[in-house]
Amino acid sequence: MSKDATLPVRGTVAELKLEKKLPKKIDAIIVAIFEGEDSIELAGGEILDFIFSTEQQADILTQLEAVGAKATANSITRVPGTDVAPVIAVGLGKADLLDDETLRRASGTAARSLGGFENVATTIGDLGLAAAVTGFGLGSYSYAGLRKETEESKDKTTTVTFISTGKDDKDVFVEAQIIVESVLLARDLVNTPSSHLYPESYSVIASNEASKHGLQTTILDEKQLADQGFGGILAVGNGSSRKPRLLRIDWKPRKAKKSIALVGKGITFDTGGISIKPGASMENMISDMGGSASVLATIIAAARLNLSINVSAFLPMAENMPSGDAFRPGDVITHFGGITSEILNTDAEGRLILADAIAYASEDKPDYLIDAATLTGAQLVALGLRTSGVMGTDEFRDSVAKTGREVGEQAWAMPLPEELDEQVKSPVADLRNVTNSRFAGMSAAGRYLQEFVGADIEWAHVDIAGPAYNTAGEFGYTPKRATGQPVRTFVQVLKDLSES
């Protein structure tokens, strides 16, 4: 058993509550404002009127106009408010352009402005409770890591109360909270340094998290991986003294008719191996297990939401290190299932461990299979820091990409051009792990993985190299470092499949 069997630290987050009336102790009330034709307008309906009288609303608007408040999306303005409490106004832009993502981002921005407040209430849920809860929950996240704590550095938990007037509000609130908590789990895992999160410890931590929710787990160690022929995972992981693992997790509800396999890349640190990466920014490679973290979080959410779909998650875990035991360019490895692959670049290791896990998952003959990976720099070149690339069988690929855009996790469908068929072939093996071309690197990786997907399985490969880890500034409900993408996309895909 690994000594690191639990996460060393978790991020802090606001405590969200749903109440039918305003709490007695309140430090501020967060309201939303729209851009009107000539002036700003308070945004809301029943809940706004429930808390503030017509005269109080007019007074708040007067105060906001007096300080030159703008209602552009994500703007924040503080005013004295009323005798109820001071007011924090967050802008939503024009009312006719409001959508869930605008509301999520504004709520996240508001959540990040609450330093110094212990108890706040908000009327923003009046405009879309699920989106507001998601924005506040994700936006309030802060990760201090392993810094020595002082009284000044202690994060004081803020309580955010949503006022409820609808009969279905509790169900909406609880579901949104579960999804938020799942995203936060993925963030915590990705933010954990590789000194504390490595294949053995990660497999135990993930298994423990899944077991809390009644999920069945199985861990294969390096000996079992060798006995069963997982040549890709072993090739990548054997260069490290921290040996590889493969974790399987199952959610099997009664009467479920459909099945899906989730596969996530779990490289706990990536040096590039013998094809070593440049030293600059290599510390960000703690995030190279982001795909596996999202898969773990998704199957836990499926269990907590009691989704009626059979879900099996596969998390191949390895540390890609250079050593005398590391695999080399020119090696030929044999994947699970027998396909051989020539290694041209040891820094194209993610597809090797995914290939084993996809072939293994395909033996169950699931109806659908999704894999997620921080896989290629080519994704960043093609789509940038915030948009995932989705490849796979046409209809399912398009559906997953569309779902991502709907929940606010930007995604774009990408092709697997037929000319790549010859480029992924090797003269000395069935495949080569990279092509000899610098073009279409993201699609080439997807084309490699396609070889391992079983027949008649609807498949989507999601490259999250940029979106999984935010190296730029925080925005909306997205913090620096781990983002938790694409957990919300995957949970919604599972919900849609379970209900269809």
Curated annotation (Swiss-Prot):
Gene3D superfamilies for this protein: Leucine Aminopeptidase, subunit E, domain 1, Zn peptidases
PROSITE patterns: CYTOSOL_AP (PS00631)
Cofactor annotation comment: Binds 2 manganese ions per subunit.
One Pfam family in the UniProt entry: Peptidase_M17
Compartments where found: Cytoplasm
Cofactor(s), names only, from the UniProt record: Mn(2+)
Keywords from the named record: Aminopeptidase, Cytoplasm, Hydrolase, Manganese, Metal-binding, Protease
Protein known as: Probable cytosol aminopeptidase
